[in-house]
């Protein structure tokens, strides 16, 4: 159920023209899903399921989000399939990591020293998420 909801929130019609803005939007949707559905997200990406191969429908659902992201990214980059796969994993790990970091920002709120430590920087990212993702995507596409 969780993977289906995430896949729906992050789906791009890869048959249409793909823009960087589309990928920024799905990155934001991914992060928003993780922040709003923390318990489900933790079950999806934690160790509760164990071996996904024992649950083929779950595995297929989990893979569909990545595959759609990879296919969409491939329309923007002129790299080999192998390089695109590596860049897509980098992108996915970044948005996945931001879910955890931004959850901490939500817990801490305004109770941190400005300019000190990762929470300060993460708070800036949280308020400028689209801009941050745009810069990251630009770097991945151009590298």
What residue ranges belong to the model's regions?
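Short, basic, alpha-helical segments at the C-terminal edge of helix-turn-helix-like DNA-binding modules
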Residues: 1-4
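Generic structural signal for alpha-helix termini and adjacent loop/cap motifs
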Residues: 36-37, 47, 105, 143
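Charged/polar positions within long, soluble alpha-helices
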Residues: 11, 35, 39-42, 74, ...
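Short, flexible helix-adjacent loops and helix caps
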Residues: 11-15, 46-49, 103-107
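Short secondary-structure transition hinges
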Residues: 39-68, 113
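Hydrophobic alpha-helical bundle segments that form small-molecule/ligand-binding pockets
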Residues: 12-16, 64-91, 140-143
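Hydrophobic/aromatic-rich alpha-helical bundle segments in the mid-to-C-terminal region
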Residues: 52, 56-59, 74-136
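Hydrophobic alpha-helical connector segments
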Residues: 8-39, 64, 91
